[in-house]
């Protein structure tokens, strides 16, 4: 991280429709702009609500991005207007979340989408959740508020979060927007910001063990074989040992050079598009779709569980449902691998627009890990998107 840059955290609002996610997003920007000027700009409800459409992995999603900062941190905050957009966003990882703010209306308590969003957050690896109990200005009864608080904590525990120790702040986003900066409802927004400030900073990709997906392989006369791709995580230095994993038997080699834009470097790091020179490896020994990794860090597998979203016809997806043993291609990192799908008990068929948990058996072993995202493709077009929730074998 460069000097003077604040540590960065990705936040997202989740929760049932009309419980106040977008209003809270507007209130966060507004209160912070009033209380901590500087880089904070007010973003109004309408600007967030008319979120522009974006494409992520071939799927169109409406997502609003706002940012705000505190003395010590910078936050990128994502809010999706529609329920379907949330599901697509979580599964495609269009906007990664380190922490989710679960918005629950004090008047309704937990609703079906509240549960669905918590489950999905868990499935896609959102580590931390803070709770905002909204619309507390219209609930006079303290006991009612305590019941909602208790119910949400139990629900979070049910889905594998630490419900007892999670911060739950009671407030009113609408009131915070209406009153001046020193009002009691604005203080509640600052209390929520305080809860975000306590969240542990995520480990940066650069600090993890080296991993790079192979995109292309070249033979350079007199120098050997060069593999190109984008370094996904970690750092690779000249002289480092490297495993080549996936599609074939594991091979071990040594990095004898790192190049970027035809310049020789000592090292490449997460985010770089680099060429890696490999010792004693012939061009035909490596192929697109394999990965280079730090020794012993990656294995290849054929079976996994995943959470998938199936595109609707209007999104360019299938026009008809599919059934068990459907065999599309799974686009994993840099390659398509054919696999067959097993459906959960009681599910006969899957309709375009559905999201569900499936099991996949691939034809060939590939280097995969929990939390990896993939596209489901048929004849080169994307028909679904998924995330690996468990490795089986």
UniProtKB/Swiss-Prot annotation:
Originating species: Anaplasma phagocytophilum (strain HZ)
Localization, UniProt: Cytoplasm
Gene3D superfamilies to which the protein is assigned, alphabetical: P-loop containing nucleotide triphosphate hydrolases, Translation factors
Cystines in this chain: none
EC id: 3.6.5.3
Spans annotated as G5: 172-174
Role this protein plays: GTP hydrolase that promotes the GTP-dependent binding of aminoacyl-tRNA to the A-site of ribosomes during protein biosynthesis.
MF terms (GO), sorted A to Z: GTP binding; GTPase activity; guanosine tetraphosphate binding; translation elongation factor activity
Coiled coil: none
Region G2, residue ranges: 58-62
PANTHER family in the cross-refs: ELONGATION FACTOR TU, MITOCHONDRIAL, ELONGATION FACTOR TU-RELATED
Subunit structure: Monomer.
Region (G3): 79-82
SUPFAM superfamilies in the record: EF-Tu/eEF-1alpha/eIF2-gamma C-terminal domain, P-loop containing nucleoside triphosphate hydrolases, Translation proteins
One of the record's GO cellular component terms: cytosol
Enzymatic reactions: GTP + H2O = GDP + phosphate + H(+)
Pfam family, one: GTP_EFTU
Family stated for the protein in its record: Belongs to the TRAFAC class translation factor GTPase superfamily. Classic translation factor GTPase family. EF-Tu/EF-1A subfamily.
HAMAP family (alphabetical): EF_Tu_B (MF_00118_B)
Domain tr-type G: 6-204
G4, as annotated region: 134-137
Entries under NCBIfam families matching the protein: EF-Tu, PRK00049.1, PRK12735.1, PRK12736.1, small_GTP
Keywords: Cytoplasm, Elongation factor, GTP-binding, Hydrolase, Magnesium, Metal-binding, Nucleotide-binding, Protein biosynthesis
The protein's name in its UniProt record: Elongation factor Tu
Sequence segments annotated as region (G1): 15-22
UniProt: GTP binding residues: 15-22, 79-83, 134-137
